[in-house]
Each structure stands twice: as structure tokens, then as C-alpha cells.
């Protein structure tokens, strides 16, 4: 059976992710207590089910301690088990809670009346939740949903599901350093040393996906050399990542604004590796 467990920080999009899996044909259960996972799998097998997706959150934190053992047991029974851990930067989470007017699951007492106290209390809840789920984050594939719209997250989850038959999925992601390094990055490369198309008025409104920007960077020796170095590094160490039984490898490429140079490098890397590997692309500041 193909089993996907979605967990992570409150407000990071677990419900959206679970709905995407439901749309992909998975039998889904929301907020399943970890202690019931084995029984649910057994029940699905009796019903001849082939897929299962469950979400778990911090409200089951006390039971999550035994989850690694449960996952190991399921894998020993021949099941294909994947864990997706959704997270986001604290500012993004605060904004989402403000938009939805929902309370954090760990807010056991009411917020103070002034907005500063409310923000501080919510921040403390998020920090506490991160600490409680740290052990689970280590065993899952981390997806940073900061700034990611719901439709993009649905597409992202769909891409991951479609990669289930591939031993390793490479996620190439562009980003802007001024907005922070992606939380889900395994490898991070800085391409801010390359000539910046931003200073060319004709190229400024374009992105690294546009031909004029690509033509500009392809004529820059440093861009060609840096691209070759990054490509060579990933190519050299890819077998080691595969041998480590990883399901996903996230390669993050950063520049100043996340619009030109990092986007160009990501597109070139994806084009190079796509014929032989399962590749996904995300341009964080453009999507």
C-alpha cells in the first residue's frame, strides 16, 4: 500500500495538502491519532485499499513519540511510506492565522487585548510547536510553504505524488536571499556574484525564464562556469543521496531578488537533469 503521512506546523497547509491527495485518489483521514495508524492500515488492507493518506498535528504530540517505530514496522511489511512535513516562516504563519481568525491549537488561554501581546503569544505557541515536532521533522520531507498560495501547494503535492515511482525526486528551487533561505533546502547555492540583469532597464521587468535574460547570462563566462560547478557538484553527490534512501533532494539557488539569476540557473539545472531524473521546479518569489 502507498501511505502518505502529512504533518507539520499549524497553519502551514496540512488541510490543503490532504485535500490534494484526496483529489489524487487517496483515501484520506484527517487528524488521526498516531496510535490508530496500524489499525487503520490493517482495515484498509481488508478492504483491498491501495492508497492511504493521513494527517496528524500537534494535538497528538504525546503519541507521536512512537511514530518512527510504527513507520518502520509498516515499511517492514512492504508498504511504501512517505512523510511530508509542512512548515513555514513564523511571519507567514502569523499572517495566515490573522487572515483566518483561527486560534493556534496550543493557545490554552486567551490573547491579551493589545495587538503586540497577541502577536507575542502566537509567536510563543509557534515556537513551542516547533520544539514539540522537531523529532518528526527530522524523519520527513520538509516542504516550506512560506509565501506559497494554496493552488501552488496543491500542484506541488500532486507533483510529489506523481514522483512516487521514482527513487529520488530533485526539487530545484529559486529564492531571494532578502526573504530568507527556504526552510526545506538540502543544498544551498549563492549566485549573487553573477552579473545582475536587474541593472539593464530592458531586462528588469523580465525573469530568468525569458529568452532575453537567458541570452544575457549565457554570454557571461562567470555564469557558465558557476552553472557547470553547481551541476557537477549535484551530479557527483547524487548517487550518495540515492544510497541514503532519500525520497527527495531540495537544491535551492539564491540571488538578491529571486527574479533573474537564480531563476535562470534553476531552469538550466532542471533542463539538464530532467532526461534522467524526476525533477520538480519551484520559483518561490515568482509563484
Curated annotation (Swiss-Prot):
Coiled-coil ranges per UniProt: none
Binding-site residues for ATP, renumbered to this chain: 8-15
Keywords: ATP-binding, GTP-binding, Nucleotide-binding
Gene3D superfamilies per UniProt: P-loop containing nucleotide triphosphate hydrolases (3.40.50.300)
GO molecular function annotation: ATP binding; GTP binding
Binding site for GTP: 57-60
Similarity comment: Belongs to the RapZ-like family.
Protein role: Displays ATPase and GTPase activities.
NCBIfam families named among the record's database cross-references: PRK05416.1
Protein name as catalogued: Nucleotide-binding protein HEAR2885
Amino acid at each position: 500500500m502507498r501511505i502518505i503521512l502529512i504533518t507539520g506546523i499549524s497553519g502551514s497547509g496540512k488541510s490543503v495538502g490532504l485535500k490534494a491527495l484526496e483529489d489524487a485518489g487517496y483515501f484520506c483521514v484527517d487528524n488521526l491519532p498516531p496510535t490508530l495508524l496500524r489499525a487503520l492500515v490493517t482495515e484498509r488492507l481488508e478492504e483491498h485499499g491501495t492508497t492511504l493518506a493521513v494527517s496528524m498535528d500537534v494535538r497528538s504530540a504525546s503519541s507521536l513519540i512512537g511514530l518512527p517505530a510504527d513507520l518502520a514496522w509498516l515499511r517492514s511489511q512492504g508498504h511504501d511510506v512517505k512523510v511530508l512535513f509542512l512548515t513555514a516562516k513564523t511571519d507567514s504563519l502569523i499572517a495566515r492565522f490573522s487572515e483566518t481568525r483561527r486560534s493556534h491549537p496550543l493557545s490554552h488561554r486567551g490573547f491579551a487585548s493589545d495587538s503586540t501581546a497577541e502577536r507575542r503569544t502566537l509567536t510563543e505557541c509557534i515556537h513551542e510547536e516547533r520544539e514539540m515536532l522537531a523529532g518528526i521533522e527530522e524523519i520527513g520531507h520538509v516542504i516550506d510553504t512560506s509565501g506559497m498560495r494554496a493552488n501552488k501547494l496543491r500542484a506541488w503535492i500532486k507533483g510529489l505524488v506523481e514522483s512516487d515511482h521514482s527513487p529520488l525526486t530533485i526539487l530545484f528551487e529559486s529564492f531571494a536571499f532578502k526573504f530568507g533561505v527556504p526552510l526545506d533546502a538540502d543544498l544551498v547555492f549563492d549566485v549573487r556574484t553573477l552579473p545582475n540583469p536587474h541593472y539593464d532597464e530592458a531586462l528588469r521587468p523580465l525573469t530568468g525564464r525569458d529568452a532575453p535574460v537567458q541570452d544575457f547570462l549565457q554570454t557571461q563566462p562567470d555564469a557558465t562556469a558557476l552553472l557547470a560547478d553547481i551541476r557537477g557538484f549535484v551530479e557527483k553527490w547524487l548517487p550518495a543521496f540515492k544510497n541514503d534512501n532519500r525520497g527527495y533532494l531540495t537544491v535551492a539557488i539564491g540571488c538578491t531578488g529571486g527574479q533573474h539569476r537564480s531563476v535562470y540557473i534553476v531552469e538550466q539545472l532542471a533542463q539538464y537533469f530532467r532526461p534522467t531524473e524526476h525533477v520538480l521546479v519551484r520559483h518561490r518569489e515568482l509563484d
